[in-house]
Amino acid sequence: MATEKTYPMTQEGKQKLENELEDLKTVKRKEVVERIKIARSFGDLSENSEYDAAKDEQAFVEGRITQLENMIRNAVIITDNGEESTVVTLGKTVTFKELPNGDEEAYTIVGSAEADPFEGRISNDSPIAKSLLGKQIGEKVAIQTPGGEMQVEIISVK
């Protein structure tokens, strides 16, 4: 029997997924059913673009519900006591600077289910996170990026 994939995430990330799931089940599902009902009233379904669009949206909503239920069921909560650490681990915010004279950047390393680079939350599967995980403050690390190799120094881990 195959083992199901686990989804490391913070409690906050799990709550966001649970909220999205609740919205999909209680609001979006009903909206889509109503749109299908209205589109059916237009008659011939073979050339009914409103009906096709509503059915496509229904498939998307149901697929997302299934995906969220699986992620929530297989969530592994990352516990963080909020204390500073010297080692980069999942759930920690790491600040580093590009060498030799680059700007400082900070990212929180989270599971892929709650990654949002625009919010400073990167997936533990990303090249940056993979390079930083397990490293310590003061360590110099080579990170492979699409633009080439980047040398950084870890400044802090919180």
UniProtKB/Swiss-Prot annotation:
Residues 4-75 form a coiled coil. Pfam families: GreA_GreB (PF01272), GreA_GreB_N (PF03449). The keyword Metal-binding does not apply. Gene3D superfamilies: Transcription elongation factor, GreA/GreB, C-terminal domain (3.10.50.30), Transcription elongation factor, GreA/GreB, N-terminal domain (1.10.287.180). Keywords: Coiled coil, DNA-binding, Transcription, Transcription regulation. It comes from the Bacteria. One of its GO terms (biological process) is regulation of DNA-templated transcription elongation. GO terms for molecular function: DNA binding; RNA polymerase binding. Necessary for efficient RNA polymerase transcription elongation past template-encoded arresting sites. The arresting sites in DNA have the property of trapping a certain fraction of elongating RNA polymerases that pass through, resulting in locked ternary complexes. Cleavage of the nascent transcript by cleavage factors such as GreA or GreB allows the resumption of elongation from the new 3'terminus. GreA releases sequences of 2 to 3 nucleotides. Belongs to the GreA/GreB family. This is Transcription elongation factor GreA. It comes from Bacillus anthracis. The gene is greA.
